[in-house]
Amino acid sequence: MSSDEYLQNNNALAVFCNLPTSAYVFNKNGNYFDLQHFINSPEMYESNLYKYMSSTNMLISAHYWDPKSPRLFAKKDIEKYNNLKVIGDITCDVNGSIPTTSRPSTIIDPYYYLDRTTLREVNQHDQALAVMAVDNLPSELPKDSSKEFG
């Protein structure tokens, strides 16, 4: 589904939306989004992912992140995103584009849980935010495939 359709989606069906970069960042000067300009000058952009967050239950981030690029959201905003239950940070850039990724998790223990107010790790409970940030996750797929499919 497109980013515009995602924002207008009001049904209870599970849907996914693969956001293009132009949907979640904007040029600070108000100029039209240009991918090459964003790659060369990421500091000239700000995130506007917030407009998607109230509709999002699970956020999966798998993009390259330059430290000069904006974070996708601010830690302090997590409390506002009540629908958000799980963040899967495939990139696992600690304190990077996903500011709730405070440490990597492991294949054996893939999730940790954060209190939405304090952002401290807590035991799992209904209001906690689950974070999956396995730093070697992309390398596990070939390993699993080799075991399962020989």
Model-inferred region functions:
Residues 73, 77, 105-107:
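Residue-level signature of transmembrane alpha-helix interfaces in integral membrane proteins
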Residues 58, 67, 85-86, 132:
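Feature representing long, continuous alpha-helical segments
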Residues 18-29, 84-98:
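Charged, low-complexity, helix/coiled-coil-prone segments
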Residues 78-83:
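Short, conserved loop/helix-junction motifs that constitute active-site signature segments
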Residues 1-68:
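Dinucleotide-binding/catalytic capping subdomain of oxidoreductase cores
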Residues 86, 91-150:
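Adenosine-phosphate binding glycine-rich loop
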Residues 65-73, 98-99:
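Glycine/threonine-rich flexible loop motifs
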Residues 45, 52, 73-74, 149:
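General structural feature for long, well-ordered alpha-helical segments within catalytic domains
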